[in-house]
Amino acid sequence: MHEFSICQALITQVEQIAISHGALKVQSVKLRIGSLSGVELPLLEHAYPFASAGTLVEGSTLEIERAPLKVNCEACGLESEVKANLLTCRMCGSCLIRVVSGEELTLMSVELITT
């Protein structure tokens, strides 16, 4: 379960942000996660309260936005959304594709309590 270590790294990063802004506590954390990131969302959500215990992040809300899987076809140039189990161009059927989005795990925003 690498989701716990992902949470620990996330909490460390968020705490550094909170401290650098003089925050007393973190209210919410927003992530953007792609379907090809390798992260199991239920496990990440389950690990979050345990990883944040005893930190400025404890008790904060974790919001997760799913990033659509988008590919660019190198044969015809079409950029489109596809399913993770069907990595081919929707227009020409080519397998010569490049993933444009859907692999990311990005910290989008942190809401802080400063007073």
Curated annotation (Swiss-Prot):
Gene3D superfamilies: 3.30.2320.80. Pfam families: HypA. GO terms for biological process: protein maturation; protein modification process. GO terms for molecular function: nickel cation binding; zinc ion binding. It comes from the Bacteria. Coiled coil: none annotated. Keywords: Metal-binding, Nickel, Zinc. The keyword RNA-binding does not apply. Ni(2+) binds at H2. Involved in the maturation of [NiFe] hydrogenases. Required for nickel insertion into the metal center of the hydrogenase. Belongs to the HypA/HybF family. This is Hydrogenase maturation factor HypA. It comes from Nitrosospira multiformis (strain ATCC 25196 / NCIMB 11849 / C 71). The gene is hypA.
